[in-house]
Amino acid sequence: MKFTKSILCAVAMFASITTYAQQQEIRVFSHRGGRMEFDENTMAAFQASYDAGYRGFEVDIRLTADGELVVTHDSTLERTTNGSGIVEKTTANELRKLQTKKGGKMAFLPELLDWLKDKKGLYVEFEMKTKPVELYPEEVLQKYCDKLYQMVMANKPADAEYVFTSSDYRGLRYLQQKYPGVDLMMITSKPLNEWTIRMAKALGVTRIGAKMPGTSRDAVAKAHKEGLIVSLWPGYTTADFMLGAYLGADFMCTDIPVEVKKFAEEKTPWLNVKY
């Protein structure tokens, strides 16, 4: 009898978890176009992720010496290209002459927006890379924010979800004041907890991108009660993807989009995953 009760309890628990997983949707998006599988932040990477079924992307934007917006993560060129020096002190033409370490070309915002503009069901995080802060004094920061916002919104498909994100909260505050209603996300290198939730609320943003290690299900539930949308990072492995889903994240980045999608389809078909 005890054994039968245990089996029934286990079945009921599994059914409960499965029902919850089916009700909860997690959107997985391609971080820098899937930097561990493809040539990060290049048009080739975004196309490869799109071809794999992804409609969610994260991109990093910096300002060149002559005022153009380039898609790149680091403030320096050495890690990802055959060039050297600081992005913000290099002209767009100089950057266009470089090759990435995988033989590609650096992407610029206009070509990315042109590629996105006819696509349906997009979710794109435009991360404002305005650190080191000495490269972006207030006047330069405002020029950067205005140009980025205006270019992105002028080319936004009607059904797209475009979000401006940053770990430099100066840009978030400026956009919020200048463009009321803009969709903003605070990025933090700390886990989701009481302090980071309070910080997001104080900034007046509706989204928080928190580090997954140290984040609990209770913290995610509290953030949801506070009206916050939760995005978790990093996404290096399929285990990271599973942890993000377990924690109850709304969004989750991944550096391995193809591997994660294959894993989810084959191993966790009960999860309600959107790409």
Residue positions per predicted region:
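Phosphate-group recognition and catalysis centered on beta-loop-alpha active-site segments
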Residues: 21-275
